[in-house]
């Protein structure tokens, strides 16, 4: 079995291309995923930024939501940025009508907590598990995590708010590392996928 993991990016809406580039730099085979049969062929999945309600509704429409929930429950590594973080939350504090989540991280998330698009900003974030300088994070109408359960590990905070969380094979950030050219968070995720593949092959 090749050591190179195949990592998908849910390609229904959002900044898909930037994630595909970041994953390729992180030595993964990166593929867009829109349908259940494409989901079945990947070792891990990125849920990109975008509009969480739209992504949720399209995931249901394309028949991806239920198989995605099942694979996350079964331990498939998954990484959500911004809207993707909201998708991985077990609970949203301020959900919009018809909004569903995949779940996977025992956390409560507040949508658009850092403000609207005109209040977007960049900030250096110390992320546990990422060596070297702080990660340059782009926050665009970003959520933050109000609280986490006992199983969830806080990896980073900004301005007193939780902005990066991991629970088992699920990773989530409020910010967009894929927009800065700093691919260390994607390397961290690719390493999670590799470790999971190795464990499954034993």
Curated annotation (Swiss-Prot):
Pathway: Cofactor biosynthesis; pyridoxal 5'-phosphate biosynthesis. It catalyses: aldehydo-D-ribose 5-phosphate + D-glyceraldehyde 3-phosphate + L-glutamine = pyridoxal 5'-phosphate + L-glutamate + phosphate + 3 H2O + H(+); L-glutamine + H2O = L-glutamate + NH4(+). InterPro entries: Class_I_gatase-like, PdxT/SNO, PdxT/SNO_CS. L-glutamine binds at residues 50-52, 111, 140-141. One of its GO terms (cellular component) is glutaminase complex. GO terms for molecular function: glutaminase activity; pyridoxal 5'-phosphate synthase (glutamine hydrolysing) activity. SUPFAM superfamilies: Class I glutamine amidotransferase-like (SSF52317). Keywords: Glutamine amidotransferase, Hydrolase, Lyase, Pyridoxal phosphate. The active site is at residues 82, 176, 178. GO terms for biological process: glutamine catabolic process; pyridoxal phosphate biosynthetic process; pyridoxine metabolic process. Its EC number is 4.3.3.6, 3.5.1.2. Catalyzes the hydrolysis of glutamine to glutamate and ammonia as part of the biosynthesis of pyridoxal 5'-phosphate. The resulting ammonia molecule is channeled to the active site of PdxS. In the presence of PdxS, forms a dodecamer of heterodimers. Only shows activity in the heterodimer. NCBIfam families: PLP_synth_Pdx2 (TIGR03800). This is Pyridoxal 5'-phosphate synthase subunit PdxT.
């Amino acid at each position: 079995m090749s050591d190179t993991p195949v990592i998908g990016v849910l390609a229904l809406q959002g900044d898909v291309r930037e994630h595909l580039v970041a994953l390729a730099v992180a030595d993964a085979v990166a593929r867009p995923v829109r349908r259940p049969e494409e989901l079945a062929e990947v070792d891990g999945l990125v849920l990109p930024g975008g509009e969480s309600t739209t992504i949720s509704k399209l995931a249901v429409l394309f028949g991806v939501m239920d198989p995605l929930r099942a694979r996350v429950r079964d331990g498939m590594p998954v990484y959500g940025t911004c809207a993707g973080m909201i998708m991985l939350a077990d609970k949203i504090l301020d959900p919009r009508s018809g909004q569903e989540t995949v779940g996977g991280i025992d956390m409560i998330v507040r949508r658009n907590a850092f403000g609207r698009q005109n209040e977007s900003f960049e900030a250096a974030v110390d992320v546990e598990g990422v060596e070297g300088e702080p990660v340059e994070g782009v926050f665009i109408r970003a959520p933050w995590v109000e609280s986490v359960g006992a199983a969830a590990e806080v990896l980073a905070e900004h301005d007193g708010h939780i902005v990066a969380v991991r629970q088992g094979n699920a990773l989530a950030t409020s910010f967009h590392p894929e927009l800065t050219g700093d691919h260390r968070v994607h390397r961290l995720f690719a390493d999670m996928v590799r470790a999971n593949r190795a464990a499954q092959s034993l």
